[in-house]
Every structure is written in structure tokens, then in C-alpha cells.
Amino acid sequence: PVIFAMANPDPEITPEEAHAVRSDAIVATGRSDYPNQVNNVLGFPYLFRGALDIHARAINDEMKIACARALADLAREEVPDEVALAYGTKLSFGRDYIIPTPFDPRLIYRIPPAVARAGMDTGAARRPIVDMDGYELSLKTRMDPTASILRGINARARSSQARIIFAEG
């Protein structure tokens, strides 16, 4: 069974209570001290970022579905070490990890592009994003201070295109 006990601060049933009855139960709550915290911080900021970046006329169902699918895709992928360190445990998709954690740095550069694409595909965008790769890179840069330095180095390397010739012998 799948149980979403969303009452806060005390869920209708705790994961311990549910697992005492059914050890295979998948339980999600709104609390950060239990696995599978369902919290609007996982969706709203990134949904809005994608919508704002395309100057969307409205947030339509397709954009919300794109947000949900991006979250589901992230949950199935390997969890970065930095997230595991923040939670003090190795996380992988399964009963106790069905949704990414709020501290997953991938959220900022995976959800807004999905939302923006859906908005552009459905005509909600007033200002479509032309360079999606550049957009994703700009989102990554916001979370990683070294990304802007590396981006500059890569840009210089691409522009100079120097050749290196190695002599034999």
C-alpha cells in the first residue's frame, strides 16, 4: 500500500505505525524527520522559476505535470554524494526514497527546464528560451560557485582552438 499522511505537524499515521501493520507500505509525510517528505519546497520554487523564465501567461496543467515527472525522474536516478552526506545515509530509489530531498542540488537545474519546455510546447511562453543548454548551465551556476569559473575557462578554450603538435621520438 501507498500512504500519504500529510497532516502537519502530526501525520494521521506515522511510518512506524504503518510498517508495524504492513512492512512493505510506502509511507510519505510532510515531516522532514521521516523518509519521503512531501513538501511544496520541492515543487513550487522550481515550477515558478521555469514559468518566470519564459514569462508564462499562466501555469498550465502540462507545466505542473512536467514538474512532477522531473521529480519522479530524479528520484529514480543515483543520488549525489553531497545529498547522502547531508542526510548521513546512502539514498536510493525504493520504499524509503520515492521523492528527492529538499537539499538535492539537481532540483534547480532539472525542474525549471522541464517546466519551461512544457510552457513553450503549449504556447504559454511569452518569451521562449532559445538556448536551453545555456539556460540549464546558468541554473547550475547559481548553485555551484565554481561553475562560473569553469564556464569561463571552457569558453576561452573553445574560442582559441589552439593546436598542440607532439614530435615523435
Predicted regions and their residues:
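Adenosine-phosphate binding glycine-rich loop
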Residues: 3-112, 116-118, 122-123
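C-terminal non-catalytic interaction/assembly regions of soluble proteins
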Residues: 56, 112, 116, 152, ...
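Long, charged amphipathic helices and adjacent flexible linkers at domain junctions
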Residues: 128-163
